[in-house]
Amino acid sequence: MADSVTFRIFRGEPDKDGVPFGKMVDYKVDLDEGMVVLDVVHRIQAEHAPDLACRWNCKAGKCGSCSAEVNGKPRLMCMTRMEDILAETPENEPILVKPMQAFPLTKDLVTDTSWAYQKDQKIKPINGPEEPDWVFHQEEADRLQEFRSCIECMLCVNTCHVLREHQMYDEFAGPRFFVRLASLEMHPLDNESRIPEIKDDFGIGYCNITRCCTEVCPAGIQITDNAIIPLKERVVTEYYDPLIDPIKTAKNLTSGVLSYFTEDFSKGSDPGNKKKAKSTFEEERSRAEEARKMDSERTEKARKRFRSE
């Protein structure tokens, strides 16, 4: 490991109109064996810039507080080892540390993530059995355990291009929100219906399955495959499955709502786009029917066991 390194850190805060204002400042820091990025930031605070704002708490990858962009990638600073950063940084180039770009700036490396918690208030709470003891087996809980491991670091939100690049904060609730919602919607004893809100209010159709949120999740949650796609399939089952309600399906399709789910395929002048869109919808419908059957079977088994025990 190098004896010293140059960190180029964003320093600034919003102006009176709330517009971020600041600059990148270089700090040369001595390194010790085994340091992580957060250690270096703390050393900069101790030796160069005591007013450098940085949010952190556990330094163990459990609280999600120290999220930032290191060399352009969303990461937890406490879990990002300096030897890995040095290996990816070109020789004689500084290491870049910036705040998350998808959230309003508070100061330096600290951002305001209150938007995400305001979104949470729109989720309907769980609606389970009236009996005081909720009984279901571990195999049914395994699906939820993954979602409960979220540390709310907001890295998935920061890397989501719908929010980061297109600023669709009113239309799209974001990947972290759907993880939280999935933990309730997929509970084996939950009877609440959130499908209309998922479709209309939370904008799940804006996600086009790039899986960038999954790639940056430090908890290893399969956000796209295990949360977002199953929720999309439930929407398709509810609104577009002719096996469930042919009349409603025909009405939804003829009203043009299908474009909500096939937006990427319907753009442009390629004559094959319509065929692609139809093929995509058929695949969605097939997966939705299979998911509906599996969910119904799991729910019915859980309820039978609950009543018998």
Which residues does each PLM region occupy?
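Short structural boundary motif marking the start of a folded domain
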Residues: 2-7
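Active-site phosphate-binding and catalytic loops of NTP-dependent enzymes
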Residues: 49-55
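Short, structured protein-protein interaction patches enriched in aromatics and acidic/basic residues
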Residues: 58-67
